[in-house]
Amino acid sequence: MTAFHSLNVSASALTAQRVRMDVVSSNLANMDTTRAKQVNGEWVPYRRKMVSLQSKGESFSSILNSQMSGSGNAGNGVKVSKITEDDSDFNLVYDPTDPDANAEGYVQKPNVDPLKEMVDLVSSTRSYEANVTAMNATKGMLMKALEIGK
């Protein structure tokens, strides 16, 4: 594994975590949106979105097996495989004054839990910071290698 390969792995992780932070930000921004899109002629609330990540190239088990046997490469980084909607039920809130309230006075609110979103945001931020640290360490090693020839 070359130093430039490790930079590419960290860069792919930075991109994936940035997408994850963008999705969490969108979830938090739309946590009160009761009219996100029309389904069968009726407005439905915003649905929480989730990011799925996967490794680029080979699967983890095949990389592990090749490393255990002393051959192969250490992986190619990570990528966003898909962004899916959370199919859990919407939250029902009693507010008969809301224009979106049903006949009983309940309003369907998005299935976004701000606590869950903040945990995801902190997790992706920590992962982002760890990858920046890894990139800086690689950069430091490359700079030291360049100084050897002086």
Curated annotation (Swiss-Prot):
Pfam families: Flg_bb_rod, Flg_bbr_C. One of its GO terms (biological process) is bacterial-type flagellum assembly. It is found in: Bacterial flagellum basal body. InterPro entries: Flag_bb_rod_N, Flagellar_basal_body_rod_CS, Flg_bb/hook_C_dom, FlgC. Its main location: other. Keywords: Bacterial flagellum. The keyword Transport does not apply. GO terms for cellular component: bacterial-type flagellum; bacterial-type flagellum basal body, rod. The keyword Magnesium does not apply. The basal body constitutes a major portion of the flagellar organelle and consists of four rings (L,P,S, and M) mounted on a central rod. The rod consists of about 26 subunits of FlgG in the distal portion, and FlgB, FlgC and FlgF are thought to build up the proximal portion of the rod with about 6 subunits each. Belongs to the flagella basal body rod proteins family. This is Flagellar basal-body rod protein FlgC.
